[in-house]
Regions:
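Structural preference for beta-rich elements and adjacent junctions enriched in aromatics
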Residues: 1-250
């Protein structure tokens, strides 16, 4: 009986906004030295099968709140160095929309992503998207939906085309975000998302519509232990970021 076999993953209901639920989950912590994930978008390392998969996405654009048509397997792994995020996006391969764009150029393309409120206080979120074709987007979002693209962090994200859809992976170093020091477990706010360009839909968990009163202050929560925030790294030019650099301490 596999965890998340229903596609839901183990979660606790926090509350609802406009009838849309938000949840708390627990994210497993590993030592960076035992993870050995190559960020290539394939999601083929054994360790991904050791953690729960989640699929609680609803249609947020247009704001119907309906269950997503296509299945998404969303997984999270925390280490002392950062957060690994993977998505397997099931859909008929002929419906995939793949274009390569410059960083932070938002066009009509399939993507998956995450928004993180690392302080858990609802003051600022960092958002990260990997597009099919490996373009990436990132920035900050202030309450409730004030998006800024003038922040670029040293992280890595990749996509991969499968016979049953596509998949993606990202590694997000804690050191590029303003992570407060906390004794013991911490709550990090998060929203998971996916764009299906072919149907002009955006899936999200929590699946609030864009007209909802709250977003940054009403994210899901992930309970994480073992996070070791380092001095924030100075932002390095994106062209020079490699997996190794993203994993470096300093």
């Amino acid at each position: 009986d596999m965890p998340g076999a229903l596609g839901q993953g183990t979660n606790t209901l926090i509350d609802q906004q406009d009838g849309i639920p938000r949840h708390q989950i627990s994210v497993r912590n590993f030592q960076e030295s035992e993870v050995n994930i190559k960020v290539d978008g394939k999601v083929d390392e054994d360790i991904w099968q050791q953690v729960e998969q989640y699929d609680n996405m609803l249609v947020a654009v247009p704001g119907t709140g309906a269950p997503a048509e296509y299945k998404t397997e969303y997984r999270l792994i925390a280490t002392e160095k950062g957060l690994y995020v993977s998505g397997i996006m099931y859909q008929p391969p002929e419906t995939l929309v793949k274009r390569r764009t410059a960083r932070d150029q938002s066009i009509d393309v399939d993507n998956f992503g995450i928004t993180l409120d690392v302080s858990g206080e609802g003051l600022v979120g960092y958002w990260f998207y990997v597009q099919l074709g490996d373009s990436v987007m990132d920035g900050k979002v202030l309450p409730e939906r004030n998006y800024k693209i003038d922040w670029d962090g040293p992280w890595v994200g990749k996509s991969f085309v499968r016979s049953d859809g596509w998949s993606g992976e990202m590694f997000l170093p804690w050191s590029m975000m303003n992570v407060p020091s906390v004794k013991g477990p911490r709550n990090i706010g998060f929203a998971a998302s996916r764009t299906v360009s072919n149907t002009a839909e955006r899936y999200q968990w929590p699946g609030y519509s864009y007209s909802s009163a709250r977003f940054v202050t009403a994210l899901n929560q992930m309970k994480v232990e073992g996070v070791e925030p380092k001095q924030q790294v100075s932002v390095i030019p994106f062209a020079s970021v490699t997996s190794d650099q993203a994993l470096e301490d300093d």
